[in-house]
Amino acid sequence: MIYTVTFNPAIDYVVRLDAPLEIGQVNRACGEDCVLGGKGINVSGVLAQLGCPSVALGFVAGETGAWLERGLAAQGLHTDFVHLENGMTRINVKIKAGQETELNGAGPDIPDEALHQLEEKLDGLTENDVLILAGSIPASLPQDVYERLLARLDGRGVRCVVDATRDLLVNVLPYHPFLIK
């Protein structure tokens, strides 16, 4: 099985304007959409389109987390998220008015116990599985979380794929991920 991990999933609220954005003024939208995502979730979506099953893992919180989960299920994606007791899954606002302006939410705080629950889910992975760690991490997680997860799986034959930048990517290289992006 392929497992994707999105540490900070989001609902992207995309607003389109037919004129330039005017700061400090009322701007009327000519269209809007909600897009469910986060890098790992996006990978699960592409895999589903290719007919390849996967399980999307990560953290969700509050009504926005429940809404995200229902939306992914409606798209035919299988999820096994850790449900946080506090906070809400983030909402990012994307304003498309010639140029794109983004307002990205911070997302919920992820307590140590919730990270431990995710680690326990990953403990069942075997050499027949692929783990894809994708995207940024929220500030409440340790900066070495990717490295810690790969260390935890080291020697078990799980093929690990990492789609990240800067230290998140560089620090996992000693664990020889199957693929990096």
Which ranges hold each PLM region?
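Glycine-rich phosphate/adenosyl-contacting loop at the front of the ribokinase-like
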Residues: 1-57, 66-67
